[in-house]
Amino acid sequence: FCTSHAFCKRVMGIGRVMCGEDVKEFLEEYSFNLTKNYKMDNRRSLQSLVEDPYFQIIENAKTNCRSVDEERLSTILALRKNVTPLMLNSIAEAWEEYRLKSVPVIYSFADMINKFITEGTPPLIKVLIVDEAQDLAELNWQLVDKLSKTVETIYIAGDDDQAIYEWNGAKPQRFVDYAGEKIILNQSFRIPKKVHTIAENISKRIKVREEKEYKPREEEGTVTEVSSVNLLPLKEGEWLVLASCDYMLSDAAKGYGIRKFLIDNGFPFSHNHYRYIPHKMMSAMNAWEKLNIEGTITVGELGDLYNYLGKAHVKRGFITKVLNDENKGQQVNKQQIIDMYGLKEECLDEEWKEVFSKTIDIQRRAFIEKALANKEDLIGEPRVSISTIHQAKGGEAENVAVLLDLSPAQQEDFILKPDGLHRQFYVAITRALQNLYLVKAKN
């Protein structure tokens, strides 16, 4: 199993994938201005160059098989407000020339698929399985069409009620209209009865959809309305908290305080799949605790520790030496670590809060203390996940809380295209395995 672009990349032997550094060098040669100024010496800012609206629209135009002008007009106003048509066309034309003359040639995801469609030979495969077909854009469908000509059996799976990427070019009707035998899997193994009732009420409001029967599990489940995320019983259990936009998860200044609430209370969480307390941070702390209690750790554990100790506590050159040491399982004691691996002896008596004060910020140190006092597990997967609805697609949890707020752009879009919003909340609500909490909108 692989993504469509990964398949095309492998089959076509493509080696160079578009990255922020490529865009930086392109801008240095052509002197274009994007929608904002980026710090060219910052790794994260460099990567965000690829996500600038100009390059997003250019990539989406390829994915949706449209001109950049058509794509710009199909893009939500908030994303294209700083994009000028003349500049867009100039950048698109110059970028295509630049990427093709580069050695090796630079490929975006859409370029990889286009390369296979125009030049590739379908491999000899007997069965083709296409999943999440309701989210495929036109270019992906052209890839499916090409592969299907030489394949004996094709399975295309999807649910048009969960087509939440139409704004980005997905064509669920292509999936619904695809010729062949239709098999409806009408039994849910996730959704309990009370959650199913809410989901059905939403799906029936979708005007353009394939009618289908969909039965819930035997369990009743629960549906609860609350006026604030602070009233959610987040102290225990597995949770998935969903919102339409990312700022609704983290912008406390606008009254959206779920992230702050979790931090203040010491509840372990991930935000759009990124852990608030990374694995490496806990591995370093555990190695420090083990070294001070047991007196010995492995070289691998020492590497975890050195990742966070930094130069203040390790002599010059030894961090790289330890990280490159191939004998990860070798046991070393305190004295060996001081004599042979460069640990500064004076730091051994310090508590973890002191020794990691330069590498773990004060907010996270306070959070870790609260979480440990709560007897929370900071090693395993965080029991609370906060996410946008689009990021959580495919996920599930025993307890799901859905913030019912809409952004101004969504409110405006809902007037003309209500189906997209109905599908979005259908997806959100059907993540619940047992208990659904609906958090009333602030707006």
Q: What kind of feature is each model-predicted range?
A:
Residues 1-58, 263-266, 270-274:
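Conserved P-loop NTPase-based nucleic-acid remodeling module centered on helicase motor cores
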Residues 4-7, 127, 134-221, 227, ...:
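Conserved helicase motor core of SF1/SF2 NTP-dependent helicases
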Residues 6, 193-196, 240, 246-437:
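Core RecA-like ATPase module of SF1/SF2 helicases and allied nucleic-acid translocases
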Residues 12-22, 197-202, 282-290:
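Short, surface-exposed amphipathic charged segments that create phosphate/polyanion-binding patches used
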Residues 23-24, 42, 51-54, 68-75, ...:
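Short amphipathic alpha-helical segments that mediate assembly, nucleic-acid/protein binding
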Residues 36-129, 138-143, 156, 166:
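Accessory N-terminal region flanking or inserted into the helicase ATPase core
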Residues 52-71, 238-258:
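Amphipathic alpha-helical "lid/sensor" segments that cap RecA-like P-loop NTPase cores
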Residues 121-125, 231-237, 396, 430-431:
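Flexible, charged surface loops at secondary-structure boundaries
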